[in-house]
Amino acid sequence: MNILFVSGHPAQVHNFRNVRAELIKQDHRVFWLTTPKDIATNLLDIYQIPYQLLYKPNKNILSKAWTLLRNVIWEICFLRQNKIDVAITRTCPYTTIAAKICGVKHIIIDDTEHAARKMKIFSNLANVVIIPECFDFQLRSDELRFLGNVELFYLHQNRFAPSSIWNLLNTESDTRFAIVRFVKWDAWHDTELVGGFTLDQKRELVARLQKHMRVFISSETELPTDLEPYRIQIPIDKLIFEVLVLD
């Protein structure tokens, strides 16, 4: 079979890379499309996964609408040219529309409940929708639910063995530390959510924590000069989960 994966976020590279490897072992032809978001392409390069780029929109509505149209048309051509049988994605409007037009089977695997609510119209167009058992609402009557979460695609004990956290953090063993995560809050599914900490609150949080332990910051955004020294420095192919595992 000819199978397509589409990623729109770096985490989705981790979600699907092991599935891709297993499918290749079974002699399937596997393709990959991605939007150039954050370090997604860097991860694909590190894992030596060939890919082609989709267009990335700007933040304004007109740009998003234009990019949606361009990507749908581009994917229609891609699906037909490569005779794709099945597309596997998280919630992805481009692929959903293109697959429906081309008659390609489309599987959506989603784990972000508030995002899934917003994108329910696209879930209804897919052939199969797979979500965690913990979802509080029903996307569709024939949805498939699983016990667990998508992080187990790459963090299951049969797939993941953490490195030594002390080597990754370049610190003494048994050092008490905290990992603080700051996100952009600019994703389409974050638009109706409270926007996290203010800059002053971030500074206060770090100041309070560092009285008791060493502080590392994982941030999607630029940090002010006084917080930048706290930014965690680990290779991009090392998961933040590696420093959350007890050594």
Residue spans of the language-model regions?
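Short amphipathic alpha-helix
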Residues: 10-24
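Conserved nucleotide-sugar phosphate-binding/catalytic loop shared by glycosyltransferases and other
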Residues: 24-67
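Catalytic donor nucleotide-activated moiety binding site of glycosyltransferases and closely related
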Residues: 47-51, 57-58, 206-234
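An amphipathic, basic-hydrophobic alpha-helix
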Residues: 61-83
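Donor nucleotide-activated moiety binding/catalytic core segment of transferases
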Residues: 71-79, 221-247
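A donor-sugar binding/catalytic signature common to diverse glycosyltransferases
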Residues: 87-98, 108, 236-247
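A conserved, positively charged/aromatic
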Residues: 107-109, 119-131
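A nucleotide-sugar donor-handling region in carbohydrate enzymes
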Residues: 130-197
